[in-house]
């Protein structure tokens, strides 16, 4: 209940309500983009400053390996399960969306841990960056395999059916191109670059940047979550007519993924704060980076399916309920 009284969460609720009543409240796209980049830069700096104190320890390496492992296992399990209920292309797209991560969910979780005075490792921001790409690469591999097996006469495109030639179907999306775009993505570069800056500059850099990256952080997060609330509410109508199995997956899948993360954190003896963030990362779903890549990497998949599930169902649940729940469980078990 205390989490629901946090200003950032209340602004998210305001955004949801405004979107639900079809208010003309709107955050200009350019400002929304700036807020996103600001939060990533501030998060990277915060992680870098923390690493400058703790150093690159064995615990850091173990935590990062845990994030990579989950980034591989989660989309594999998701694809295996979803193939029973939707087309292979839609299964690959949804599995990639839920196998990747939401930066805003992670930022909100970091803020929650700080409010609760729960210690966590700054290196978990690097873990977030590492978890974004594996799911995309695996989805492209799945899709390329499906294209090779597809009929030369027919293929599904974004929920519709189109007749195309044999040669077109044999074309596949280049893994190299996907890798390049994943690792040169501006948001990831900014996050990792800011972390390096924080690591190099240490206490002096933290003092210099505090008025911008520290004092303004909460207010910027409130503004951004207001925008996310508007987007979530406006994407909910797209869920009408969708399979109940997919809705259930959007609710229960993240809980299962968080359980996997909890088990791994317990086996690796991770601290409660790191374990909570690992659970949040595993339970989150991408609604910006992955959908943007999937639109051209998997044109056969239905964008309204994977986008509306992640933003309309999973994101609000994680923000309102998931983060405090996962934190409490991590504190009790780790």
Where would I find each of the regions flagged by the language model?
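Membrane-interface helix-loop junction between the first two transmembrane segments
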Residues: 20-37, 52-53
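Membrane-interfacial loop-to-transmembrane alpha-helix junctions, especially the N-terminal start
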Residues: 33-35, 187, 242, 246
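Metallocofactor- and cofactor-centric catalytic cores in central/energy metabolism, strongly enriched
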Residues: 36, 42, 68
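Membrane-helix exit/interface motif
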Residues: 49-52, 263
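Membrane-interface helix-boundary motifs at transmembrane edges
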Residues: 24-31, 83-84, 178, 236-242
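Hydrophobic alpha-helical bundle architecture
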Residues: 233, 238-252, 262-272
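Helical transmembrane-bundle signal
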Residues: 39, 43-47, 224, 228-231
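Alpha-helical transmembrane segments of multi-pass small-molecule/ion transporters
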Residues: 1-17, 29, 56-220, 224-228, ...
């Amino acid at each position: 209940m205390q989490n629901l009284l946090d200003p950032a969460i209340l602004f998210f609720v305001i955004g949801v309500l405004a979107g639900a009543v079809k208010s003309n409240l709107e955050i200009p796209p350019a400002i929304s983009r700036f807020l996103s980049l600001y939060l990533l830069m501030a998060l990277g700096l915060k992680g870098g400053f923390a690493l400058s104190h703790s150093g690159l320890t064995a615990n850091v390496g173990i935590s990062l390996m845990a994030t990579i492992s989950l980034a591989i296992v989660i989309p594999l399990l998701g694809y295996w399960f979803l193939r029973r209920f939707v087309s292979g292309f839609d299964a690959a797209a949804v599995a990639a969306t839920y196998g990747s991560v939401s930066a805003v969910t992670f930022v909100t979780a970091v803020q929650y841990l700080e409010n609760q005075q729960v210690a966590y490792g700054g290196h978990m921001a690097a873990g977030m960056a590492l978890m974004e790409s594996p799911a995309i690469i695996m989805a492209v591999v799945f899709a390329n395999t499906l294209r090779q097996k597809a009929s030369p006469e027919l293929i599904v495109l974004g929920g519709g059916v189109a007749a195309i030639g044999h040669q077109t179907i044999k074309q596949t999306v280049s893994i190299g191109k996907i890798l390049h775009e994943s690792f040169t993505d501006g948001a990831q570069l900014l996050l990792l670059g800011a972390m390096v800056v924080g690591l190099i500059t240490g206490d002096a850099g933290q003092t210099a940047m505090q008025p911008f990256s520290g004092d303004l952080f909460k207010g910027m997060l409130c503004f951004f979550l207001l925008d996310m609330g508007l987007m979530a509410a406006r994407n909910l109508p797209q869920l009408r007519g969708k399979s109940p199995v997919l809705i259930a997956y959007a609710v229960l899948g993240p809980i299962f993924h968080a359980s996997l993360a909890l088990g791994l954190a317990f086996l690796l003896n991770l601290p409660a704060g790191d374990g909570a963030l690992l659970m949040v990362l595993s339970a989150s779903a991408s609604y910006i980076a992955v959908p943007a890549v999937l639109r051209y990497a998997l044109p056969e998949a239905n964008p309204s399916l994977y986008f509306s599930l992640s933003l309309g169902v999973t994101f609000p649940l994680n923000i309102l309920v998931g983060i405090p729940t996962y934190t409490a469980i991590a504190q009790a078990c780790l």
